[in-house]
Amino acid sequence: MQSSSLDPVASERLSHAEKSFTSDLSINEFALLHGAGFEPIELVMGVSVYHVGFQFSGMRQQQELGVLTEATYRARWNAMARMQAEADALKADGIVGVRLNWRHHGEGGEHLEFMAVGTAVRYTAKPGAFRRPNGQAFSSHLSGQDMVTLLRSGFAPVAFVMGNCVFHIAVQGFMQTLRQIGRNMEMPQWTQGNYQARELAMSRMQSEAERDGATGVVGVHFAISNYAWGVHTVEFYTAGTAVRRTGSGETITPSFVLPMDS
C-alpha cells in the first residue's frame, strides 16, 4: 500500500510523539510486546468520508455492482493509507491492533465514514528489521498476544489486507414464491449470490497478500453490510493479516492455566 501525504494537523500531533507515547494497547498486550522487543510510539489513524454513488440494477438481475464495490473499497483504502503515512512519518516498524470501522456520516445514507486506527511500534533491538521490503511499516489487526505467538512461530506480519464485493441478489418470481409457501426449500438465487460475492471478496484479499509478497493470511474475518441499499444489495467484506515466514520458529507447548478468580 502506498502512503498518502501526511495531514498537517496530524504532523503537529506526531511531532510530540518522542516525548510520550499514546496507545490503545491493553496492559497485557503492552507487556507482551515489550517482552518481544517492541515499544509503542504513538496512536496512528486515518479517516475517509466518502460519497457512494448510484448504480442501477434491475430487480431480476444477479450481478456485482462495480461502482459501489469501488467506492467502499477506495474509502477504506484512503483511511488505511493515511494511517500508514502517520506510521511511516514516525519511522515505525509496524502498526499493531489495526481496527477499520465505519459509520453513516451526515443526513443521507450515501455518505460513509471509514476510520483506521492502530498503534505504531518500533523494534528496539534492530529498528527496521520487520519493515516490508519497500521500507514501509507492517500493519496487522492481530492482538498483542497473537502477534507475539506469531513471531515465536517463525512468522512475521506483512500487511493488513482486505477484499470486498457489493452484490445485487435478484428478486425471485411470483410463482417461485408461491411454490415455497409452507415448504422447506433452498433459495438458489441467494445461495449462488452469496457464493459469488464471498469468492470475489476472498480472491481480492488473496491478491493483495500476493502483491505484498506474503505466504499466507491469518485471522481472516467476514462482515456483511447493506448500508442504505436495501435488503437485496449487500456488501461482503473480508480482511486479515498477511504474513511471511522468517525462520523455523519454536514449538509452542500448550500449558494449563487455572484462573484464581471465581
Swiss-Prot record:
Belongs to the UPF0145 family. One of its GO terms (cellular component) is encapsulin nanocompartment. Disulfide bonds: none annotated. Gene3D superfamilies: Hypothetical protein apc22750. Chain B. Keywords: Encapsulin nanocompartment. This is Encapsulin nanocompartment protein Rv1762c. It is found in: Encapsulin nanocompartment. Cargo protein of a type 1 encapsulin nanocompartment possibly involved in protection against oxidative stress. Its main location: other. It comes from the Bacteria.
